Design a protein with these regions (language model features):
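Hydrophobic/aromatic-rich transmembrane helices and adjacent perimembrane loops
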Residues: 135, 273-289
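Membrane-embedded alpha-helical segments of transport systems
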Residues: 55-56, 128-131, 308
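A cytosolic-side transmembrane-helix exit/cap motif
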Residues: 120-123, 169-175, 279-282, 297-306, ...
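Membrane-interface alpha helices of multi-pass inner-membrane proteins
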Residues: 118-141, 261-268
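Membrane helix-loop boundary segments at the extracytoplasmic
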Residues: 91, 96-99, 269-280, 310-326
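Membrane-interfacial entry segments at the cytosolic side of transmembrane helices
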Residues: 141-153, 294-301
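Primarily membrane-embedded glycan-assembly and transfer machineries that use lipid-linked glycans
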Residues: 1-118, 144-274
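Aromatic-enriched
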Residues: 286-356
Length: 356
């Protein structure tokens, strides 16, 4: 089922003008295009690249888990739980998606003992491969955020120049392509059913026969049309509150904030594939590795495990259909994510207010 990021990038890398092409808009960052141009020109198959980044991702997760926990038995069990008991690794490998690799870099930066400059360099590299990861960077504190932003700017500029594309117009074209994404749509119900975000469900509800021509249907359509604004508004308000309270200091160990931002990116991003929930590996590791008790830690671990869980696993013994399987699993994962989101909002907003 090889139709993910790597197959698209293999095509884009063959274009002479990937960002100024009038007939084609694409939102991939220039560093990715540049890397794939060199990779394809070397005569290598994209499948090799796909396998490499996924194996390397596991090495990053294992080495940082071992470094943080100093317990090889725990690190091995944690890695096996994540790979074997969840679908993210296998389906990411099947799709040829780079998101798993980006999450592993984020995991490595958090739990491997690195200097500020080393963290900023790795985070800049991650943003240069997947810009959406930027919403998590403020959690590292104002200093790392500032250094990372400067380095990322230079990486983007140099990459555009290397591709012989105009920097400003190419960047605007990339942002416009990213903001005009139309997923999910009625033209592909399989994608709609596998969407973990709340928007796919709103889109489906809006097109029910009893609702489609009603005023409620128009209301749902207006919400759906402004989904990007709603998502970024929630992120902006969240970071404004937490940064003002922390005074720019690092919030790396704030497990409830990690859960909230992760679930926000899953439920409120325009389209969330089945592998996007893999970001919850970060708060899961904090919860399982902490030597101090964390409020509601058992509940949080249980809910994350339910999101990861392969619900239709027993069907594999008789009849395996990847699309039906994903549809069942993604709906279960969406339902648990929504419950978890309600729980975490209650804990970090209402309970904090009552305590204050």
């Amino acid at each position: 089922h090889y139709f993910g990021d790597t197959s698209e990038l293999a095509y884009l890398s063959k274009l002479e003008d990937p960002y100024t092409n009038e007939n084609f808009q694409q939102s991939y960052p220039p560093l990715l295009i540049l890397l794939f141009k060199n990779f394809i020109s070397s005569g290598q198959h994209v499948l090799i690249f796909n396998i490499f980044i996924h194996v390397f991702s596991l090495l990053l997760i294992f080495s940082s888990a071992l470094k943080s926990s100093k317990d090889i038995d725990f690190a091995v069990k944690f890695l096996l739980f994540f790979v074997v008991c969840s679908k993210f690794f296998i389906y990411s490998l099947d799709r040829g998606n780079i998101e798993f690799f980006i999450i592993s870099i984020l995991f490595f930066v958090l739990f491997f003992d690195l200097t500020i400059i080393q963290k900023a360099l790795l985070l800049s590299f991650a943003i240069s491969l997947k810009p959406s990861i930027l919403i998590f960077i403020p959690i590292f504190g104002f200093k790392i955020l500032s250094i990372t932003s400067i380095i990322t700017f230079f990486i983007y500029s140099i990459s555009f120049l290397w591709l012989k594309e105009p920097i400003f117009s190419s960047f605007l074209n990339m942002v416009n392509a990213f903001s005009s994404t139309k997923f999910p749509t009625l033209h592909n119900w399989q994608l709609l059913e596998q969407d973990l975000s709340i928007w796919g469900k709103i889109y489906w509800l809006r097109h029910l026969d009893s609702i489609v021509e009603s005023s409620f249907g128009s209301f749902l359509q207006s919400i759906y049309n402004n989904r990007s604004i709603i998502f970024y508004l929630v992120i902006l308000i969240t970071w404004s509150i937490f940064i003002s309270k922390s005074k720019g200091k690092s919030l790396e160990n704030n497990v409830e904030l990690w859960i909230f931002i992760s679930l926000t990116s899953i439920l409120l991003f325009s389209f969330s594939g089945v592998y996007k929930s893999a970001i919850l590996i970060i708060p899961l590791f904090i919860l399982m590795n902490s030597s101090k008790p964390i409020r509601n830690e058992n509940l949080y671990i249980f809910l994350i495990a339910m999101i990861f869980l392969q619900v239709p696993i027993f069907r594999h013994m008789f009849n395996f259909d990847i699309y039906s399987d994903l549809s069942i699993w993604s709906f279960f994962s969406f339902a648990v994510s929504l419950i978890f989101y309600s729980v975490i909002i209650n804990n970090i907003v209402f309970k904090v207010e009552r305590n204050e």
